[in-house]
């Protein structure tokens, strides 16, 4: 009788095991921090004794740190372009430091690191100084409406950006390709050309 019960229970147990959901490993969060005018020697997690950087140190302790990193350029637009596209900035003539009314340097048809992360199932975002241009042509942005192409056209699900730098107009924040807190009674007009 025991043999009969075991013969009956074993297949039932195997079927029950096959029905259990398989746990999928959780993907790690990936945060890339780009800081202008900051060398690795400026951070206390890399040995700096004078400047204390506890927030960055906490991130470094919990995550991955670069110990042998290189850049294609020592300035903003070119290094951002190369990081996001994986391409050398000096192979294009429009990847120098951009004005606030520059056309977007990264073309929507180019593959970016954001595209690769999205393909891998990540939600992507870009926050902070953009300095890669926005819109299709220099000076052609509609600062009072939807600005395209922009970050969503090159793989980012969410963006909250400053177009260039705090010393280059327009000095506004742009959320998902629209000026944040836009006031229609005070339209924005930007020109880098002499009147």
Give the positions of each predicted feature:
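Formylglycine-dependent sulfatase
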Residues: 19-195
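Bacterial Sec-dependent N-terminal signal peptides
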Residues: 1-25
């Amino acid at each position: 009788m025991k043999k009969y019960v075991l013969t009956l229970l074993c297949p039932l147990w195997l079927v029950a095991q096959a029905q259990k959901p398989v746990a999928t490993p959780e993907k790690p969060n990936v945060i890339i921090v780009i800081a202008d005018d900051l060398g690795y020697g400026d951070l206390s997690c890399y040995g700096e004794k004078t400047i204390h950087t506890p927030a960055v140190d906490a991130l470094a302790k919990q995550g991955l740190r670069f110990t042998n990193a290189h850049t294609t350029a020592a300035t903003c637009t070119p290094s951002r372009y190369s990081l996001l596209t994986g391409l050398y900035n000096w192979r294009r003539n429009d990847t120098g430091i951009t004005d606030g009314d520059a056309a977007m340097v990264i073309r929507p048809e180019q593959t970016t690191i954001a595209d690769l992360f999205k393909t891998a199932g990540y939600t992507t975002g870009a926050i902070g100084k953009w300095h890669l241009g926005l819109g299709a042509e220099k000076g052609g942005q509609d600062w009072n409406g939807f600005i395209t192409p922009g970050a969503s056209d090159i793989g980012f699900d969410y963006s909250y950006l400053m177009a260039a730098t705090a010393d280059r107009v327009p000095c506004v924040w742009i959320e998902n390709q629209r000026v944040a807190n836009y006031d229609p009674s005070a339209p924005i007009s930007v020109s880098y050309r002499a009147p």
